[in-house]
């Protein structure tokens, strides 16, 4: 019968600062729960002060000869850190690149529908790549495609900026707009 590998593995070290008995220094610089510096003292005295306040002793700065420790509620600290990370993650919305495909001889109503879709993408904070595809003899009238992309650029000049100017790649013309 095979043994489970985690049975003989050492216990996992928790990430984050050392707290209470995990602190390894003999003398520490103590900062109390009010943020006032209490001075250098033995670790045992600092632990007693933390227990007296019914809080934890947390190692704030471990790099020095006498590490800086602070008396605070570690559970509350972790909760607030998690909350900050979640808020930062929520704020950091990644901008997607949405694509709108059109043809050079697009009808007015079809253009309006595409324009509404582009406006919605800008409201959501997404970039828009407009792809204008030419077929057959339409390649002879590339100026019509350029005029159409210029019209799109003019229609959205208040809400978007041109990130990539219109350019011809094979049988299609592309332009990228980003929200302002």
Swiss-Prot record:
Which residues, if any, are the signal sequence?
none
A Gene Ontology term for the protein's cellular component: membrane
- Spell out the subcellular localization from the entry: Cytoplasm
Q: Does the keyword Protein biosynthesis apply?
A: yes
Q: Which UniProt keywords apply?
A: Cytoplasm, Initiation factor, Protein biosynthesis
Supply the Pfam families for this chain: IF3_C, IF3_N
Molecular function as annotated in GO: ribosome binding; translation initiation factor activity
Tell me if Protein biosynthesis is a UniProt keyword of this record. Answer: yes
Q: InterPro entries, from UniProt?
A: T_IF-3_C_sf, T_IF-3_N_sf, Translation_initiation_fac3_CS, Translation_initiation_fac_3, Translation_initiation_fac_3_C, Translation_initiation_fac_3_N
Q: Which domain of life is it from?
A: Bacteria
Q: What is its main location?
A: cytoplasm
Annotated GO biological process: ribosome disassembly
Listed under subunit, the entry gives: Monomer.
Q: What does this protein do?
A: IF-3 binds to the 30S ribosomal subunit and shifts the equilibrium between 70S ribosomes and their 50S and 30S subunits in favor of the free subunits, thus enhancing the availability of 30S subunits on which protein synthesis initiation begins.
What family is it from? Belongs to the IF-3 family.
Per its record, how is this protein called by name? Translation initiation factor IF-3
Q: Supply the gene name.
A: infC
């Amino acid at each position: 019968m095979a043994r489970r590998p985690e049975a003989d593995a050492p216990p996992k070290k928790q990430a984050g600062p050392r707290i209470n008995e995990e602190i390894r220094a003999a003398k520490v610089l103590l900062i109390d729960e009010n943020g006032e510096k209490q001075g250098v003292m033995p670790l045992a005295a600092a632990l007693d002060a933390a227990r007296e306040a019914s809080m934890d002793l947390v190692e704030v700065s471990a790099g020095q000869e006498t590490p800086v420790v602070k008396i605070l509620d570690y559970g509350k600290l972790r909760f607030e850190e998690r909350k900050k990370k979640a808020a930062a993650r929520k704020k950091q919305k990644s901008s997607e690149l949405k694509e709108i495909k059109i043809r050079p001889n697009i009808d007015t109503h079809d253009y309006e529908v595409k324009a509404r879709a582009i406006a919605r993408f800008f409201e959501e904070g997404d970039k828009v790549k407009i792809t204008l595809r030419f077929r057959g003899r339409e390649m002879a009238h590339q100026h019509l495609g350029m005029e159409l992309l210029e019209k799109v650029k003019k229609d959205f000049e208040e809400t978007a900026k041109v990130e990539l100017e219109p350019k011809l790649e094979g049988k299609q013309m592309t332009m990228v707009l980003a929200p302002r």
